Amino acid sequence: MFRTITSRLAFSVRQAEETVKPRIAYAQRSGRRIKEKVALMQAKRKEAGETGAPEKPGKFVLKTGKGTRDYGPAQSALRNSVLQTVTETFNRYGAETIDTPVFELRDVLMGKYGEEGGKLVYDLQDQGGELLSLRYDLTVPFARYLAMNKITNITRYQIAKVYRRDQPVMSRGRYREFYQCDFDIAGQYDLMLPEAECLGIVDELLTKLEIGEFFINLNHRLILEGMFAVSGIPAKDFKTICSSVDKLDKTPWEDVEQEMINEKFLTKEQTGKLGELVRFRELNSDLNNLELLEKMSQLPDLGQNDKFKKGAEELKVLIEYLNVDGVTTVRYEPSLARGLDYYTGAIYEAVAPKALEGTAVENSEDTAGQPVGVGSVAAGGRYDGLVKMFDSKANVPCCGVSFGIERLFAIMEARQKVAIRTTQTEVYVASAQKNLVRDRKKLVKMLRSAGIKTEMALKANPKLLTQFQYAEERRIPLAIVIGEQELKDGVVKLRNVVTRDEQTIKLDQLITAVRDTLAAL
């Protein structure tokens, strides 16, 4: 009886609560909160690669993974030409090549890229064995290779793909899977000679690739540490403040200063002093590199700082070597502050801010609505302590440079004015009549055996006009035409595909004639 009364009472209370609903109090911020939640949901969907309305259950969207792309014949041909130029340049500087696994032990990569870089490493799913991650760059695997094989002296290059969980912007060559081309010098050498080699390669290679105007920013870790010290910034805050300073190439000083004050708790006095130093190039744009370093050395506090003095003297030696080499694209930039999780000396970065001027993507925007730019196309520096992270007894000083080949490719693709050939075919063998497929094949075999790149139509009786059109579309320089009468006379017609001029050549002189004609083109 008691239980029945209690149940009825509880039901009456619930009914009353549902009938008389409490008045909703709307906060002024509720609308903003809803917008923030919607924006967050949209950001998560974008991160997951979703676009538009959600797909129906079970429907498969055929596409490449976010931050990756396919390369068709034209793009592959252009990229291969870039890689060939890179390889030839590296070989000219006496480098050997190595290859390392696409994935490394997770412990090899962790702790080498700082807090932000570490978040971008792709971890592989644990299969009950070793914990593995995809390589983030080629430098740390190279240091692991040196330590593991007890190598103390090598000049090496490596061209391979790396992987980063970055926010991709395809139109400016920013991907999650991309090629890096690294050149490094490991070993005990005299001051700044390896750095001069690395910067010489950057200058030579970017000039050859014709990406437009570029310059190479140059700084030194010790100079940065000296500037921070005289600004009253504790050594423990070095890396976190450097991450703010490094934004000066894209962000006004006022915004960077507010970030350091509001988020990193520097005082106005500290940021004021630091701002004068890191913007020294901007405030003294009429001075050359040596003059700029000399003027900074004359500042009362900075000129007496031991770290600054050592870094400045080393850069002066490097700049003098570059002057001897005729490298004029290097620019001393006190605000350059990248890669400081393992760089110990000189640091440098090549940028091409006007590379996309006059191209179709010049005024385009990325997915976040920001203007599309290319960013750095090469970067590097000295990293004397990286090998020691793997072997405490190893003392292998290193310096090097890494080229972002996808960014260079994006520039060249945007600037490309002439269609690039997708094959290397030199000769196309055509027939003017039917039933000559065997004779065409004999000619193709003869030419290929002589080392001449040759094609023919893979049809028994192709039309002559169709064969000529194919050769013209593929920009094959020469065509060899055979007919019944030519075969009886032991001759062929050698045709210039561009000019359409033809000459009759004896069959036993064909190889020599083809080689001479190709050499004259």
From Swiss-Prot:
Keywords: Aminoacyl-tRNA synthetase, ATP-binding, Ligase, Nucleotide-binding, Protein biosynthesis
GO cellular component: cytoplasm; cytosol; mitochondrion
Database matches in PANTHER family: HISTIDINE--TRNA LIGASE (PTHR11476:SF7), HISTIDYL-TRNA SYNTHETASE (PTHR11476)
Protein known as: Histidine--tRNA ligase
Biological role stated in the UniProt entry: Involved in protein synthesis. Catalyzes the specific attachment of an amino acid to its cognate tRNA in a 2 step reaction: the amino acid (AA) is first activated by ATP to form AA-AMP and then transferred to the acceptor end of the tRNA. Required for germ cell development.
Disruption phenotype: RNAi-mediated knockdown results in gonadal defects including smaller, narrower gonads and reduced fertility with either no oocytes or no fertilized eggs in the majority of animals. RNAi-mediated knockdown results in an increase in the expression of gpdh-1 independent of hypertonic stress.
Enzymatic reactions: tRNA(His) + L-histidine + ATP = L-histidyl-tRNA(His) + AMP + diphosphate + H(+)
Name of a matching Pfam family: tRNA-synt_His
Enzyme class name: ligase
Protein's UniProt keywords contain Repressor: no
Record-listed L-histidine binding positions: 137-139, 164, 180, 184, 338, 342-343
UniProt entry tagged with the keyword Aminoacyl-tRNA synthetase: yes
Coiled coil: none
InterPro entries in alphabetical order: aa-tRNA-synth_II, aa-tRNA-synth_II/BPL/LPL, Anticodon-bd, Anticodon-bd_dom_sf, His-tRNA-ligase, HisRS-like_core, HisRS/HisZ, HisRS_anticodon
SUPFAM superfamilies to which the protein is assigned, alphabetical: Class II aaRS ABD-related (SSF52954), Class II aaRS and biotin synthetases (SSF55681)
One of the record's GO molecular function terms: histidine-tRNA ligase activity
GO biological process: germ cell development; histidyl-tRNA aminoacylation; mitochondrial translation; nematode larval development; translation
EC number(s) reported in the record: 6.1.1.21
Organism of origin: Caenorhabditis elegans
The family this protein is said to belong to: Belongs to the class-II aminoacyl-tRNA synthetase family.
